Amino acid sequence: MEELKVEMEEETVTFTGSVAASSSVGSSSSPRPMEGLNETGPPPFLTKTYEMVEDPATDTVVSWSNGRNSFVVWDSHKFSTTLLPRYFKHSNFSSFIRQLNTYGFRKIDPDRWEFANEGFLAGQKHLLKNIKRRRNMGLQNVNQQGSGMSCVEVGQYGFDGEVERLKRDHGVLVAEVVRLRQQQHSSKSQVAAMEQRLLVTEKRQQQMMTFLAKALNNPNFVQQFAVMSKEKKSLFGLDVGRKRRLTSTPSLGTMEENLLHDQEFDRMKDDMEMLFAAAIDDEANNSMPTKEEQCLEAMNVMMRDGNLEAALDVKVEDLVGSPLDWDSQDLHDMVDQMGFLGSEP
């Protein structure tokens, strides 16, 4: 019994000594709180977002960028329908972007959903505690818009740029259509003008053929024209119809001769028109078909068949200059040779 008592006393002494030793140590230094005891952890939103991005199984939908200092949402539709309900109990992608905006995330690439924050880095989850939630976001957004700073856009980001591009393309297409319509209108006007000129040319050619046929069919007209030409040449002493050689220093007499030549040519033109009008009046009084009408009909047939062009392949200058040099006898011979154009017996 005494041995047991001694052992108990030894144990008691030993325990008392340890307590005394611990109390002596505690008295030497003041008590301190545990490190990080009063610090709060990162917000659940940041923790869930970090875990979602860090998960290799979701790399096809959301993952870190090549620099691993930002994350990219590759498929916004699948992100909204699968990941958001799993981590945040909702499927509103715009609400997720608003949450990023409140924690200071910024959009990196305007063409894709890439966001970055200085405290949101791959492999450094402990930096999430440095990301603080912003207050008075409405006032901050106004200040950022006024200073031209970029921020995360809420809603259907990217569609506005696409709409603007489509509007520009639409404006370019409308301008091109207007330009093509103007060109079409101008082309139609040019074609109409060319058709009008062609009709006028054909009409003049037909009138010329008709005039020549009637003139050659009426020997009185040819004889009267030849007599008048001969009389006027003898009266004025001019060789009408022949070309004159121009000198380097024309004299006053030469200029007067040229003036008389022009006046004489105008008179002859008026006389030809008067004779031609008289011939037409005489033929209008005759109801029976004449050789002139037969000639005109034949010439019209030739014009329709296209055979008149080869028969009338004569220069205009020759037609203008030659008749004024003919004598009366030459005209009679020509009319006699063209028996089918002569007057009726």
UniProtKB/Swiss-Prot annotation:
Null mutant phenotype: Heat-sensitive phenotype. Reduced expression of SGIP1.
Annotated keywords: Activator, Cytoplasm, DNA-binding, Isopeptide bond, Nucleus, Phosphoprotein, Repeat, Stress response, Transcription, Transcription regulation, Ubl conjugation
Motif Nuclear localization signal: chain residues: 231-238
Conditions for induction: By high light and hydrogen peroxide (H(2)O(2)). Up-regulated by heat stress (at 30 degrees Celsius) and remains up-regulated transgenerationally in the unstressed progeny (at 22 degrees Celsius) via heat-induced REF6-dependent depletion of H3K27me3 marks within its coding regions.
Stored SUPFAM superfamilies: Winged helix' DNA-binding domain (SSF46785)
Keyword Ligase: no
Motif position, AHA2: 324-333
Cross-link Glycyl lysine isopeptide (Lys-Gly) (interchain with G-Cter in SUMO) mapped to chain: 315
Pfam family, one: HSF_DNA-bind
Comp. bias regions, Low complexity: 17-30
An annotated Gene Ontology molecular function: DNA-binding transcription factor activity
Annotated GO biological process: cellular response to heat; cellular response to hypoxia; cellular response to unfolded protein; heat acclimation; positive regulation of DNA-templated transcription; response to heat; response to hydrogen peroxide; response to hypoxia
Post-translational modification: Exhibits temperature-dependent phosphorylation.
UniProt-listed InterPro entries: HSF_DNA-bd (IPR000232), WH-like_DNA-bd_sf (IPR036388), WH_DNA-bd_sf (IPR036390)
Further information: Plants overexpressing HSFA2 show increased tolerance to combined environmental stresses.
UniProt function note: Transcriptional activator that specifically binds DNA sequence 5'-AGAAnnTTCT-3' known as heat shock promoter elements (HSE). Seems to be involved in other environmental stress responses. Activates ascorbate peroxidase 2 (APX2) in addition to several heat shock protein (HSPs). Binds to the promoter of SGIP1 and activates its expression in heat acclimated plants.
Designated name of the protein: Heat stress transcription factor A-2
Source organism of this protein record: Arabidopsis thaliana
